[in-house]
């Protein structure tokens, strides 16, 4: 299956090992991955700060880069939500761009959503002999409605002991940007 990977800014700049691990998982599951070189920030940081007009350049670039992709996978629920939902609203006064955004929005998936709901995989063959917890991010859980896929994948990691987090569905605040 051919997919285009939306590589999120924070992963690119600060956590490239996370991006590489995600690529390895997808390749192991039989995906042929393209990481478009012309992609930039999705623009959601501008939108979250109230700068919708400033976001339009990044938004239009993302649409142009990904509009011919069959599947787009993002390891960031925030970016996936922005592309899936916010783009059409921000481009509402530009019908042609809004239509193009709508087509892209139908093809974007959050990482765990893609693995479980599209590939039909709940066990990626991982082993991790330690205790972990999981923060259920606002964008993934509440705005995108993705609740089961991350948990199904965690449940099937051999050796993993899952410890529920207090207030797991509370907002992390992302340094105040989302609150």
Q: How would you label these PLM feature ranges?
A:
Residues 1-179:
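Iron-sulfur cluster-binding electron-transfer modules in prokaryotic oxidoreductases
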């Amino acid at each position: 299956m051919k997919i285009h990977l939306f590589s999120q800014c924070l992963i690119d700049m600060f956590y490239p090992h996370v991006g590489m691990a995600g690529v390895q998982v997808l390749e192991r599951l039989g995906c042929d991955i393209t990481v478009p070189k012309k992609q930039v920030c999705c623009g959601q940081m501008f939108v979250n700060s109230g700068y919708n007009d400033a976001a339009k350049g990044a938004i239009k670039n993302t649409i142009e880069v990904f509009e011919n992709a069959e599947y787009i996978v993002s390891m960031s629920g925030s970016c996936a939500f922005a592309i899936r939902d916010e783009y059409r609203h921000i481009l509402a006064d530009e019908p042609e761009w809004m239509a193009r955004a709508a087509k892209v929005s139908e093809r974007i998936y959050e990482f765990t959503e893609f693995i479980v709901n599209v590939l039909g995989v709940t066990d990626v063959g991982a082993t991790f002999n330690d205790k972990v917890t999981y923060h259920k991010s606002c964008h993934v859980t509440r705005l995108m409605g993705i609740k089961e896929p991350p948990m199904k994948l965690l449940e099937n990691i051999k050796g993993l002991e899952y410890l529920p987090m207090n207030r797991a569905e509370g907002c992390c605040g992302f340094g105040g940007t989302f609150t």
